[in-house]
Amino acid sequence: MNDKTHLGHTARKRFGQNFLHDDYIIDSIVGAIAPQWEDNIVEIGPGLGALTEPVASKVKCLNVIELDRDLAARLAEHPVLGDKLNITQADALQFDFGKLASTERPLRVFGNLPYNISTPLMFHLFEYADKISDMHFMLQKEVVNRLCAGPNCKAYGRLTVMAQYYCRIIPVLEVPPTAFKPAPKVDSAVVRLEPYDTPPFIAKSLKCLTQVCSMAFNQRRKTIRNGLRDLLSIEQLQEIGIDTTKRAENISVEEYVNIANYVFDLKENK
């Protein structure tokens, strides 16, 4: 049996599959999630059920979204959990998470995310932030560093700003490659994201905030006045209180929101 086969299933590279098997890490993650019986909880990419089984044992019902139809079928036939699982065979990047949430029962989301889609998947989930109470994800350690970064460091980028706009970010634990089969070539980490009921800084238009961040970080080595020159003049940036000699990685989340709100007001007043 090669090192890509675990519990009779061969990991598929196109799905970014690395199966967690370390009991200590599994127990630590489940402890961090702390599932409760009545939770409205969903797992993305349950795989072979390393997290599915212990979480499902603590809740009334567990929603799972699995792209791999073989793994979805395997879970449906699980001798113990089959009746507890609400299984959707689908691409989480296209899935409407709003269908699973309600005002009374916001979603709790967790998963060992495929590293090849983790960033776009988080951006997709941010669209449902008002319907989610918390998220626990296993990610590439580099991505967790980006989520937690502050201004003035290399890890700080568009993902940082958007994640910290929507959520409080809490690192949980680091995970070595040996905890997986097959072992990835990178270190991993678990992170908790708690969407704010009300963000600390309110963007008038999320579309404008996304546009500003994209423009700034697409040219991150340029000063902010050059990176955003198609949107705002030096004088306008100075009017907002932005140091125009700074680069994208030196601008705080609050400052990005202020820039986006200024851009929005300009468009509204045209």
From Swiss-Prot:
What InterPro entries has UniProt attached to this entry?
Answer: KsgA/Erm (IPR001737), rRNA_Ade_diMease-like_C (IPR023165), rRNA_Ade_Mease_Trfase_CS (IPR020596), rRNA_Ade_methylase_Trfase_N (IPR020598), rRNA_adenine_dimethylase (IPR011530), SAM-dependent_MTases_sf (IPR029063)
Named from the GO MF annotations, one term is: RNA binding
Enzyme class label:
transferase
Q: Encoded by which gene?
A: rsmA
What is the reaction catalyzed?
adenosine(1518)/adenosine(1519) in 16S rRNA + 4 S-adenosyl-L-methionine = N(6)-dimethyladenosine(1518)/N(6)-dimethyladenosine(1519) in 16S rRNA + 4 S-adenosyl-L-homocysteine + 4 H(+)
Task: Tell me a GO cellular component.
Answer: cytosol
EC number(s) for this protein? 2.1.1.182
Lineage summary:
Bacteria, Pseudomonadati, Pseudomonadota, Gammaproteobacteria, Alteromonadales
Keyword Hydrolase attributed: no
Q: Where in the cell is it found?
A: Cytoplasm
Which key words are in the record?
Answer: Cytoplasm, Methyltransferase, RNA-binding, rRNA processing, S-adenosyl-L-methionine, Transferase
Matching SUPFAM superfamilies, A to Z?
S-adenosyl-L-methionine-dependent methyltransferases
Q: Mind telling me what this protein is named? A: Ribosomal RNA small subunit methyltransferase A
Report residues binding S-adenosyl-L-methionine. N18, L20, G45, E66, D91, N112
